[in-house]
Amino acid sequence: DWAMHFTQGSEFAFRSLWITNHPLLVGAPYSYPFIVNWISGLLVRGGMEFFSAFVVPSYIYSIVFVFILTLFYRVVFRSRGIAMLATSIFLLNGGLGFWWYLIEIKNNLSLAAIFGSRQEFTHFGEKGIEWISVITSMIIPQRSFVFGFPIALCVAILIYKEIQKRHKDWSVKRFIIAGLIFGALPMLHTHSFLALGIILACWFFTPFIHTKHKKESFFHPLFCWVAFGATALIIATPILLTFYRTTIVATTSGSFIKWFPGWFVNQNGEHSEMNWIWWWFLNWGFTLPLGIVGWFLMPKKKKLIIAPFFVLFVLLNLFLFF
């Protein structure tokens, strides 16, 4: 991924700070969340050494990433211990690939086998392991992810803290601020924009479902959400039309989103011979079943907050996003 990031950053550093044409494909629209590389290009223009302009910010983004992720869990679960545990599970994912790592060590007990195996055990296709380590597949190579995802979490934290209050105490100002940031997310990390959009769409219904506030008026929370949506729409619309028009057309024509139930174990998938439940167990281990059990044990209010993440899981198992 970094070769592509260097190319895009070079465009901003040595040509123009504003482009709408793709730096690699002649005549193609620029349809990538570019701000992270725009910042690096700006640093190069300011005199920073080229590679340092990419490596140093990415190092900072990684630290901020872990901090914001932990903060998100702490805000939701109100426990430092749970926040640390959840962050560790998020970062050290990889399913049951470690089982084959232990087998390799058993068959060849050596320092080379322990520390220098050539097999990536969180991406072991022939065994059905495809849920690659977040660190090696996302945080290190995907600069837009490590930059944009924490910002999306900040929006989620801001909205979450508001919807935990009594309806009359919701802050319109904070919803507008959240809308401003959310609307800019397509330039930061498009997938975070889409995922957070689904999550917030589900959270929209919390004041109408949660029984504690039945006697309160729903007008104020509805107004807050309208303020958020209108602000986000004003910011996001020109960005989407300028940089993602081709993607939007592809989506409406059905060529961007495809019905593909089962994902990797679909009849046309890479592991069509495997059972869907077994495939997910291989890739998530006990994390997914324990998460489902934990959801049923949660208070109703927490269930409403966590439910959108299960919605995302279901959607990604039914549709293929190109």
Language model features: what each stretch is:
Residues 156-159, 195-210:
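Hydrophobic transmembrane alpha-helices of multi-pass, membrane-embedded glycosylation machinery
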Residues 170-182, 199, 225-230, 299-322:
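Transmembrane alpha-helix segments characteristic
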Residues 136-139, 174-189:
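Membrane-interface alpha helices of multi-pass inner-membrane proteins
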Residues 85-89, 180, 213-243:
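Hydrophobic alpha-helical membrane-interfacial segments at the cytosolic entry of transmembrane helices
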Residues 147-148, 152-173:
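Membrane-interface transmembrane helices that cradle and orient dolichyl/undecaprenyl
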Residues 122-138, 248-278:
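Juxtamembrane membrane-water interface segments that cap and precede transmembrane helices
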Residues 1-151, 190, 194:
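Active-site lumenal/periplasmic loops and adjacent helix-entry segments of GT-C-fold
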Residues 141-155, 233, 258-321:
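Alpha-helical transmembrane segments at the extracellular/periplasmic loop-to-helix junctions
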